[in-house]
Design a protein with these regions (language model features):
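Acidic/Ser/Thr/Pro-rich low-complexity tail/linker regions in eukaryotic proteins
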Residues: 1-454
Length: 454
């Protein structure tokens, strides 16, 4: 974490390795070049993902400070500092050996940006430091956005549920994704601090979780996998993709328990939009504009493959096998040209598995491949759930059956909470399809209630 501050605040940065010295900017340029090559052919292993995490954070702060210095140099008014919540979200991309340094390691950097924090005091516990920081973020911003960062493994002792673990990056909901929703409409945050452990917010319970998927897709090497001739075909293929296929089929089975959907949409239509957080309606999917017809076709092909043999309307397993073997499996000439003898042997071992056939189908057509990619992006580390009101949604992996779904004044996303004593433990933000634009938000404030996070 300290290196982020050193890079962002330093006027001239160098990197030393033995007797060699390299300017920081040249190192970054070289790493970016390698990253681009990795994206094309991956000759050096899984480099690109780690590059993004290690470089984007200091680059973010460098950019903020550069703009601030430029405006000051030309006598322009100082820019409004970014909110502490956004800065902490970016800082969470880095790790600190000493958990207290997740905050104290960027103290000078925050000061340079015009953001004030309590003076560093290493005699305080990690929980106390993190709680003070979260409280400061809420009061300075007069908002509750810091709560979006809550999902974590909660390794810090005595940490209130509404306080993020600032030394663990969950990446569950980037801020630029949150802004496209408005589950509490244009309401403003209303909150009170009962004591150092409790935060009370104004909101409304709109249901509970009655069922959930069990398999959670983790952050694995599969995100870098491409169905191309230069892949390594071995038992690792099954290890990588088994949880994906298992989760996909669980989601289809869970959606199949619904006979109708509260919005009047078809159940399959609701599933289609839930798994990608309604992105086609919001005209955004990565850096691409969705073509609605291609999107619908992509989901149709996706669902046909992943639900093969599950329902009366699904394609049969025999049909899936026939289509895949007839179109997508490499023929002998291709095998001899692109695969080694060992690869050909390993391919024979996996090509008859359901996992291989489904993945072959998903990667064979562009609309299906694109839909599958966005599903992986949105559903990684998430569960699909069914609510007591018949809605489908996605939640952090810690969510359980019985957890409540609440809308909170001032927050764009619904939150998952769990009863604990006289209060509620905050689990994290959720996407609940059909209530993301304020459909369930009360018309009058008197219908709201105080929710106590402990």
């Amino acid at each position: 974490m300290w290196t982020v501050q050193e890079v962002a605040l330093g006027r001239y940065k160098i990197v030393m390795c033995g007797s060699r010295i390299l300017p920081w900017d040249e190192l970054v340029f070289g790493l970016e070049t390698v990253s681009i090559q990795e994206n094309v052919g991956r000759p050096w292993g899984d480099f690109e993902g780690s590059f993004g995490a290690s470089i984007s954070c200091p680059a973010f702060f460098e950019s903020l400070l550069r703009r601030r210095r430029m405006l000051e140099k030309h006598g322009a008014p100082r820019p409004k500092p970014p909110t502490l919540s956004v800065v902490l979200f970016e800082a969470q991309r880095q790790k600190a050996t000493e958990p207290k340094d997740a905050i104290y390691g960027i103290y000078s950097l925050l000061s340079a940006l015009g953001i004030d924090l309590p003076t560093p005091d290493y005699s305080k516990s990690v929980a106390q430091i993190y709680s003070e920081t979260a409280r400061t973020a809420i009061l300075q911003n007069n908002g509750l956005e810091i709560l979006y960062q809550v999902p974590s493994s909660r390794k810090v002792d005595n940490l209130p549920s509404w306080v993020p673990d600032f030394n663990e990056h969950n990446g569950h909901y980037p801020y630029w994704k949150v802004e496209q929703f408005s589950s509490s409409r244009k309401s403003t945050a209303k909150f009170e601090f009962k004591d150092k452990q409790k935060l009370s917010v104004l909101g409304k319970c709109v249901g509970s979780i009655i069922s959930r998927s069990e398999t959670v897709i983790g952050w694995t090497e599969a995100e870098e996998f491409e169905f191309t001739h230069n892949m390594d075909v071995d038992a690792g293929f099954l290890t990588i993709f088994e949880p994906y296929v298992k989760a996909y089929r669980e989601w289809c089975e869970l959606a199949g328990t619904l006979e109708s959907y509260p919005t009047g949409q078809s159940v399959l239509g609701a599933l289609c939009h839930t798994l990608v957080h309604d992105e086609p309606q919001r005209k955004e999917a990565g850096d691409q504009k969705w073509d609605i017809k291609s999107f619908a076709r992509g989901f149709s092909n996706w669902h046909s493959a992943v639900s093969a043999g599950m329902f009366e309307y699904s394609m049969t397993l025999d049909f899936l096998s026939g289509v895949v073997e007839g179109k997508y499996l490499p023929n002998k000439k291709s095998l001899d040209k692109f695969f080694s003898a060992d690869d050909r042997k390993n391919l024979e071992a996996v090509k008859d598995t359901l996992i291989y056939k489904i993945q072959a189908w998903l990667h064979a057509h562009e609309p299906t491949r694109t839909y599958d990619y966005v599903v992986q992006t949105r559903m990684r580390t998430s569960r699909l759930v069914i609510t007591s009101e018949g809605y489908m949604g996605t939640t952090p992996p810690m969510a359980k059956v019985g957890d409540r779904i609440v809308l909170v004044a001032g927050l764009s996303l619904p939150m998952i909470v769990r009863r604990e004593g006289e209060g509620d433990r905050l689990i994290g933000p959720a996407y609940i399809h059909g209530i993301m634009d304020g459909e369930r938000w009360p018309e009058v404030e008197s219908d709201l209630e105080w929710i106590n996070f402990v």
